[in-house]
């Protein structure tokens, strides 16, 4: 009987991608089958994230639950991967000696060897090195069960913003060769994937080697991806404003398959705070790029990241952030109160903003962006949207679910499931707090 693998994932889309590749890897090497029940698993993997506060405590809390399973089944293998693993290394086993494997984002491709070593030699393994692109050289082609898929085109970040641990946990920027990226996307298209989301911690810093020895940037890569047969929708995330280039803006005019949605983290609307964060740009430079983009795509949906309560942030600084939000009209954000991450330069700054002020500012910010989101959703009522049907509605088996270009979930009634994985036109009939409702336009499907 095949061994069972359970993976619990914290964090970003890159971690979701990495977890899927772990499953592909061990499926090929050890014929394991995924399970959603940790109690029946032979291998437990925890893919961790260190971006937010108390990340380590969250990891050890989960490992404490798994310790009981290990006591019941001494042959159970427990592995910890991701950014907390990269950051903590041997310290994870010092605190949780029942953990068998510790590996970073750049060494997950070595999982088969780790599993063999632990299973046969009973020797725990810790490998949190940064072997650059070797990870992708040794991963099998991915499998996909849906019409949308993530494709990692680069790893790491070289920006070293003062608040961020990513350069220390995932390493410097390393881009995958163009041919490898296109081959993976073509493989996914052959499995029925219609939408790809190009991933990277700083994806618009992509500089991929071509087969003739030149380098290709993200704008050129998007043009190539658009030519892959079967791929009809392209997204990318996450971007940095400094490298949101003119050529990338121009590609929105030349590649219709690139969605009218952009997530461009700004973190703050105060130049003084941006300087303390070492973001490398001003608010004016950020807004200028968005204005030029809006000239090309007037209907583009814009989202961002915000940190409130960064050390030294005053009421005036926060007001400037709100002014930026009101000027741009973001319709979604990932927003958090500041918490110091160990080993980052900002951790040495005096955290002089009270928790009460942080929470109050966050509530104000999130409420304003929610208002923008609801306004945009209401304006979509009556319009016809091209929807990629992704599956059955979670709340009603008689309905199907899909996403618009601007990343809104749409539920609509359908007697047939044959259109799952296809594009259909849906007229929006209602805007709900977290989704849209619609009616399919039967004569127009793709």
Curated annotation (Swiss-Prot):
How is the cofactor bound here?
A: Binds 2 [4Fe-4S] clusters. One cluster is coordinated with 3 cysteines and an exchangeable S-adenosyl-L-methionine.
Q: Which GO terms describe its molecular function?
A: 4 iron, 4 sulfur cluster binding; metal ion binding; N6-isopentenyladenosine methylthiotransferase activity
Checking SUPFAM superfamilies in the record gives: Radical SAM enzymes
Q: What is its EC number?
A: 2.8.4.3
Q: Where in the cell is it found?
A: Cytoplasm
User: Which residues bind [4Fe-4S] cluster 2 per the record?
Assistant: 157, 161, 164
Which reaction(s) are listed as its catalytic activity? N(6)-dimethylallyladenosine(37) in tRNA + (sulfur carrier)-SH + AH2 + 2 S-adenosyl-L-methionine = 2-methylsulfanyl-N(6)-dimethylallyladenosine(37) in tRNA + (sulfur carrier)-H + 5'-deoxyadenosine + L-methionine + A + S-adenosyl-L-homocysteine + 2 H(+)
Q: How does it assemble?
A: Monomer.
Put simply, this protein is called tRNA-2-methylthio-N(6)-dimethylallyladenosine synthase
Q: Which organism is it from?
A: Hahella chejuensis (strain KCTC 2396)
Q: Which gene encodes it?
A: miaB
């Amino acid at each position: 009987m095949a061994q069972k693998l359970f993976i619990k994932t914290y964090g970003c889309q890159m971690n979701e991608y990495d977890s899927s590749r772990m499953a592909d890897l061990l499926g090929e090497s050890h014929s394991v089958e995924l399970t959603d029940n940790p109690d029946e698993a032979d291998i437990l993997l925890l893919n961790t994230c260190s971006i937010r506060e108390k990340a380590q405590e969250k990891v050890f809390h989960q490992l404490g639950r798994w310790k009981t399973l290990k006591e019941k089944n001494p042959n159970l293998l427990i592995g910890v991967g991701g950014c907390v693993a990269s950051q903590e290394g041997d310290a994870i086993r010092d605190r949780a000696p029942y953990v068998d494997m510790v590996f970073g984002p750049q060494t997950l491709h070595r999982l088969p060897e780790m599993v063999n070593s632990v299973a046969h030699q009973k020797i725990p393994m810790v490998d949190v090195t940064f072997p650059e692109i070797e990870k992708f050289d040794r991963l099998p082609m991915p499998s996909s069960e849906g019409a949308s898929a993530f494709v990692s085109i680069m790893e790491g970040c070289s920006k070293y913003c003062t608040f961020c641990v990513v350069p220390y946990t995932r390493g410097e920027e390393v881009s995958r060769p163009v041919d490898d990226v296109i081959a993976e996307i073509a493989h996914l298209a052959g499995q029925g994937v219609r939408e790809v989301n190009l991933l990277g911690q700083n994806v618009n810093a992509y500089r991929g080697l071509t087969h003739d020895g030149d380098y290709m940037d993200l704008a050129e890569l998007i043009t190539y991806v658009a030519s892959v047969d079967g791929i009809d929708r392209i997204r990318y995330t996450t971007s940095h404003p400094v490298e949101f280039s003119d050529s990338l803006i121009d590609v929105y005019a030349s590649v219709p398959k690139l969605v009218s949605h952009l997530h461009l983290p700004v973190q703050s609307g105060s130049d003084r705070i941006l300087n303390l964060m070492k973001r490398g740009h001003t608010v004016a430079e950020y807004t200028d790029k968005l204005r030029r983009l809006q000239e090309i795509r007037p209907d583009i949906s814009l989202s961002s990241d915000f940190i409130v309560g960064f050390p030294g942030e005053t009421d005036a600084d926060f007001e400037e952030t709100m002014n930026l939000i009101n000027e741009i009209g973001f319709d979604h954000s990932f927003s958090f109160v500041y918490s110091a991450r160990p080993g980052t330069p900002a951790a040495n700054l005096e955290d002089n903003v009270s928790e009460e002020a942080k929470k109050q500012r966050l509530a104000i910010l999130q409420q304003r962006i929610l208002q923008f989101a609801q306004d945009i959703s209401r304006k979509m009522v009556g319009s016809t949207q091209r929807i990629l049907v992704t599956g059955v509605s979670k709340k009603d088996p008689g309905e199907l679910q899909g996403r618009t270009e601007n990343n809104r979930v749409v539920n609509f009634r359908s007697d047939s499931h044959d259109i799952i994985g296809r594009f259909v036109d849906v007229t929006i009939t209602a805007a709900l707090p977290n989704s849209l409702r619609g009616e399919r336009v039967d004569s127009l499907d793709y």
